[in-house]
Amino acid sequence: MVNVWLELAPLFAIIAALFGLGFWWQWRNRRKEENAHADAVAALATGLGGRVLDPAEARPWSAELLEPMREETDGLVNRLSMASPRSFGTTLDFHRGRWAVRVGEASVEKSVQNGTRTEYEHRIEVASAPLPPMKISRRVHGGTNLFGRPLGPDHVSAQGGELVREIPVTVAAVGGQWHRVAFPPGPFDTQFAVFTSDPAAVARAFTPEVVEYLLAQAHGLPSPLHFEAGLVFGTRRDRINPDHVLAAVDAILGLLDRMGVAPGHPPR
């Protein structure tokens, strides 16, 4: 028996070496991807006259208003599947015209059947003058449930999703109410749900120009788009794409300009 094990030892050594080589190759590729991504975001920040933040600073301005990576970390099932704590990654600050902007990534590793998978999101934040708290969300029509049956018009996704209905922390803190804004039946009401603590003020702000712009930018804006505590922000899945993120930033700024919103100072 000892001789058998001795004869098999070289084979086991080769197998172990192959496994080690595979892990090293994956690690090397991940490092190359990380470095390439960091370089691309740094080049974007430099081109905008901005800067990439140190890891200690890389936290969303709005983190206390909406927890980053909430879809992946909220609830018992999500917590049990987390292979690492949530972390904040590549984040850049810059000015776009008059506006102070922060774009930052967050991530969490989740356990899957064959190892781990990293989930990412990035958040776009703009500092603005104080506004009535508001959320604007696209309504998603169609689709099917887990049993393949069509979703009805009263399904939560067709009403803008759950997050848009959730009372913001600043409104809840003062015992405020959270209302859906009633718009006349038409293309805008079909595509968007808007909730706020001040429906009258929001209805006045949604001029025909604003409504037309929102319809034109329906897929260019993050959804939901939050207005709260001097910040306008939205979150999208996946990492920052340096080739496309400015289009989303400019879509938000275009909306603020049409609403007559003034720039604000970012939180310290």
Language model segments and positions:
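Core hydrophobic alpha-helical transmembrane segments of single-pass membrane proteins
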Residues: 12-20
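Charged, low-complexity intrinsically disordered regions
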Residues: 40-268
